[in-house]
């Protein structure tokens, strides 16, 4: 049987287990964009902020979409995932149809001219990062699950249900976990 951690690679979803109660990651869904011997990097998908992109990111004054908390690392940096690697220079493909980064000025131009739609991009403040071996240790103590990613999940605005739907999609015993109350002691 393959160890769950051995399935981890760029383009997979990282789901906080029900045991992970740390506030930065409780019931989060992350997309892993980089995973190698040096560590891992990803973005939290289900933590929209109260700020809109137009209020916080220079050059994107027309974008009324929410800015997302990508994670607790370098929260003074802005990152983006998008589906238009075919027209954005410097983008890194995460899986077919999903790209990370690229030329920010080009993205601004494409959005402002309507060539690219806001629904094709998601902006993040900061990122989630793990040093070499750190994420593996967290797996060993049961902090994370791995699931398949899709563009539908990445660009979904069903933030409240994203974690339970993603956990439930794993099937079997995970369906019970997905339905567990957030604070079982209050039942």
Curated annotation (Swiss-Prot):
InterPro entries tied to this protein: AlgH-like
Pfam family membership, one: DUF179
Gene Ontology CC terms, in alphabetical order: cytosol
HAMAP family to which the protein is assigned, alphabetical: UPF0301
Family affiliation: Belongs to the UPF0301 (AlgH) family.
Designated name of the protein: UPF0301 protein Cpha266_0885
Organism: Chlorobium phaeobacteroides (strain DSM 266 / SMG 266 / 2430)
């Amino acid at each position: 049987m393959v160890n769950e951690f051995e399935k981890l690679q760029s383009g997979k979803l990282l789901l906080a287990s029900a045991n992970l109660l740390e506030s930065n990651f409780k019931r989060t869904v992350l997309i892993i964009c980089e995973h190698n011997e040096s560590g891992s990097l990803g973005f939290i998908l289900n933590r929209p902020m109260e700020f809109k992109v137009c209020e916080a990111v220079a050059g994107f004054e027309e974008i009324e979409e929410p800015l997302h908390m990508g994670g607790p690392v370098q929260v003074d940096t802005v990152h983006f995932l998008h589906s238009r690697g075919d027209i954005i220079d410097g983008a890194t493909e995460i899986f077919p149809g999903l790209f990370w980064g690229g030329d920010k000025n080009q993205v601004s131009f494409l959005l402002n001219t309507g060539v690219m739609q806001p629904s094709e991009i998601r902006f993040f403040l900061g990122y989630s990062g793990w040093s070499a071996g750190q994420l593996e240790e967290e797996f060993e103590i049961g902090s994370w699950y791995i699931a398949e990613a899709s563009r539908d999940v990445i660009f979904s605005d069903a933030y409240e249900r994203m974690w339970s739907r993603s956990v439930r999609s794993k099937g079997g015993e995970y369906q019970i976990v997905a339905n567990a109350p957030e604070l079982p002691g209050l039942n």
